[in-house]
Amino acid sequence: MVPKGGSLDDWRGAFRVYADALDKQAEGEQRLTEIDQRIAALRPRLPADTSVSVVRWNPQGPMMMSGHLFVGQLLDQLGLKANELAKQTDKRPHTDILSLENLSKADADWIFLATLNPDGEKALAEARQQPAFTRLKAVEAGHLASVDGQIWSSSSGYLAAQQVLDDVEKALLH
């Protein structure tokens, strides 16, 4: 059984399809309630009016992830505001590759940097040496968090949600 919909749809709907298929509806709803309770407890502790960007870095360069994806939905529930460019990706999971000259379009109060493999890590390490990167206000403020690209840009579900919430809590509150 495969849920109908795409990566921009509500992740909870797909989660419920899997719970139904496994005849674990009650357990599935309990897991969603746990996520909601964790969000409700975390949200008031986070800084108000904070903008965030989720940037996936690969060997070709950075892409801004849509604010409508799974992670964007969670960040929105936490009261964190998506960067303007992330809001403009209505029908796509991410922007085109951003040049270093356009990297400022991905700036926010906090940037979560996701990489998928060692080649992406190498490209990110090289970018960190570029003036366009070091001038980002998030970088200047030390508000840069490296996160798992598989979870932050390619996953959804209960375990992924818990990891995203762990990462946000670690970055913004510690």
Label each region the model flagged.
Residues 106-174:
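Structured C-terminal subdomain patch of bacterial secreted/periplasmic proteins
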Residues 44-46, 93-116:
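Ligand-binding pocket segment of bilobal, Venus flytrap-like solute-binding proteins
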Residues 44, 72, 135-137:
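Short secondary-structure boundary/capping segments
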Residues 60-61, 71:
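Redox- and metal-dependent alpha/beta enzyme cores, enriched for Fe-S-associated oxidoreductases
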Residues 63-68, 123-124:
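Short, well-ordered secondary-structure micro-motifs
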Residues 51-57, 85-86, 113-114:
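Short, conserved beta-strand edge motifs with alternating hydrophobic and charged residues
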Residues 1-59, 151-174:
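Extracytoplasmic substrate-binding proteins
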Residues 66-96, 151:
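Alpha-helical, coiled-coil/dimerization segments enriched in small aliphatic residues
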